[in-house]
């Protein structure tokens, strides 16, 4: 449990440090984005804590990924999208998306 807490605080502090450096170099009016991946409930850091330090949340939406027998159920995709919107309580960007298992052994769900 202590390791989880340490990791959470460390990731947040590192993100804050990076944002501060970028703002100093690029200017306070620059927009800082972080591209969050899925699997947020399995991660050992709080996405919303990191989101406090950036301007825009971005998300990689992969409803189908290689080796799956079937796509991620729509309600799980919706949960991920809701979670990203809630991280800053504002709209977010989809910066990567895949609608089929491109380059993997199972294709053609959608």
Where are these regions (language model features)?
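Aromatic- and acidic-residue-enriched carbohydrate-binding clefts of CAZyme catalytic domains
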Residues: 1-5
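Short, electropositive alpha-helical surface patch
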Residues: 109-110
């Amino acid at each position: 449990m202590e390791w989880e807490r340490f990791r959470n605080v460390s990731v947040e502090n590192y993100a804050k440090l990076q944002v501060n450096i970028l703002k100093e170099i690029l200017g306070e009016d620059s927009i800082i984005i972080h591209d969050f991946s899925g699997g947020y409930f399995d991660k050992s850091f709080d996405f919303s804590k990191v989101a406090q330090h950036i301007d825009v949340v971005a998300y990689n939406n992969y409803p189908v990924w290689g080796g799956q027998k079937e796509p991620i159920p729509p309600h799980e995709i919706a949960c991920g999208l809701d979670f990203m919107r809630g991280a800053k309580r504002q709209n977010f960007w989809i910066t990567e998306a895949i609608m089929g298992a491109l380059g993997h052994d199972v294709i053609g769900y959608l």
